[in-house]
Design a protein with these regions (language model features):
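Fe(II)/2-oxoglutarate oxygenase catalytic core
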Residues: 1-143, 147-199
Length: 199
């Protein structure tokens, strides 16, 4: 069976990358690992939701582009999670699937990860089981599965990954997690199962 991560170009203009960074400039907090603080993840994060980031038409255009590429409705996606890594910050090896099968949104099917800046050194995304490191290059993106195509109840075992430390310069990046079902309707109604580790 083929194990894969795929590189793609989600942004038609690098100005779209700047929209995420400027829209989140005043909203960064310590990143969570799942739903809690952890020493395995030391970056800061901003959710592109109900703020300047989500109001920018350039970020909405990227959202539609990802919907077209994944063939998943926008409502199946979590909001963009914007990440900022200062030199030395990291996210140790982890898996992105943290959403239980019993939740209204179902499991995370795909991760769509975009690089919003190019640090001078370091900051790649490493897939240890695949012996692959994707370099952090502004405007590029990587997509990978979190569950098995033939058995959605099983995690994809080959997409454990880590954010390698940026050694020179700052890295900005963004996650988009695509679910099996509609994520935003229950989230907008305040369903706690959309905000907690349930897997």
């Amino acid at each position: 069976m083929e194990r894969w991560v795929k590189a793609t170009l989600p942004m038609r203009s690098l100005l779209q990358a700047e929209a995420f960074i400027s829209g989140c400039a005043a909203h960064f907090d310590r990143s969570l690992a799942g739903d809690q603080l952890s020493p395995v993840r030391t970056s800061t994060q901003c959710w592109c939701s109900n703020n300047e980031c989500s109001a920018d038409p350039r970020t909405a255009a990227v959202e539609r582009r990802i919907s077209n590429l994944t063939r998943a409705p926008v409502r199946y996606m979590e909001p963009f999670q914007i990440l900022k890594y200062e030199p030395g910050q990291f996210y140790k090896v982890h898996h992105d699937q943290n959403s239980g099968l019993f939740t209204p949104q179902g499991p995370r099917v795909y991760t769509f990860f975009m690089y919003l800046s190019t640090p001078a050194e370091g900051g790649g995304t490493r897939f240890a089981d695949l012996d692959v490191v994707m370099p952090a290059v502004k405007g590029n993106a990587v997509i990978w599965p979190s569950i098995m195509d033939a058995s959605p109840s099983r995690d994809e075992p080959y997409t454990n990954h880590e954010a390698q430390p940026t050694t020179v310069g700052r890295k900005y990046a963004s996650n988009v997690w695509v679910h099996q079902f509609d994520y935003r309707t229950p989230a907008d109604k305040g369903c706690l199962l959309t905000h907690k580790n349930t897997h």
